[in-house]
Amino acid sequence: MNPIAVTLLTGFLGAGKTTLLRHILNEQHGYKIAVIENEFGEVSVDDQLIGDRATQIKTLTNGCICCSRSNELEDALLDLLDNLDKGNIQFDRLVIECTGMADPGPIIQTFFSHEILCQRYLLDGVIALVDAVHADEQMNQFTIAQSQVGYADRILLTKTDVAGEAEKLRERLARINARAPVYTVTHGDIDLGLLFNTNGFMLEENVVSTKPRFHFIADKQNDISSIVVELDYPVDISEVSRVMENLLLESADKLLRYKGMLWIDGEPNRLLFQGVQRLYSADWDRPWGDETPHSTMVFIGIQLPKDEIRSAFAGLKK
């Protein structure tokens, strides 16, 4: 039985998540999609906006599914599986829409820490929507708005028809998250091929989306930022493990996501790793072949000790 692919929609209040969700549900993509959404307050509004195109909508109220009501999220996920197994509903993809003030971190961890959920669901990717009109002000005022960008596998820039292309904002987003490509979306209309099957939580060699350019952005502007570490020499596997363990011991609470491709001394294959906060995995990938071996790592987090991290990896050079 193949696991059910899960897409998480995040983004600050008014960024356009429900508009995008409505577009997803009305597209002729051939998927049977279940939806979990959550709202502040007693009554859901978005389920009235979405319509009845989803197989089943679970509306979670009275708190964020991503933080204070994580048990309720687990119950909703298990309830969907129970109804699926009983034949009451059919779906082959799940979309979770987080409320605008929610931290995606705990919901991501749910899919790795719950025995049944990690077997039956596969977290495919995190899609962050960013309002081009208000994003700078929101990110200046609310660290959570930066955090949502930091967790993303894809960043969708909305309202550029009003704000323009917002090149400085793109630079800022790249500084926060060096591994997520940025796409423009107007009124939720976007090729779903860019949103589905992103393999955001699979071990892969594409660690950094592009070489970010940061000359527009001052360090003090973002609480959350990316650190890209590149090494042109092999590293000992036990030594790099020690560095990673120390990093997690000292900064796990500050780390959002991290990925890497490592050149391990004496090994013909590249080693890939990826993690979310304290949870991470690693595995051997294909041989280097004719490619020049190298290591590339990206760490995304809150006020990370950049100099210490770079120094720790630089110390691995023999």
Predicted features, each with a name:
Residues 2-138:
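Nucleotide-state-sensitive switch-loop elements of NTP-binding domains
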Residues 132, 136-151, 155:
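Flexible active-site lid/hinge loop adjacent to a nucleotide/diphosphate
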Residues 86, 118, 144-147, 219:
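Structural motif
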Residues 73, 141, 166-169:
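Amphipathic coiled-coil/heptad-repeat helices and related helical stalk/stem segments
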Residues 147-289, 302-318:
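C-terminal accessory "lid"/substrate-recognition subdomains
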Residues 92, 223-227, 295-297:
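Short amphipathic alpha-helical segments
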Residues 290-296, 300:
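C-terminal engagement modules used by replication, chromatin/transcription, nuclear envelope/ESCRT
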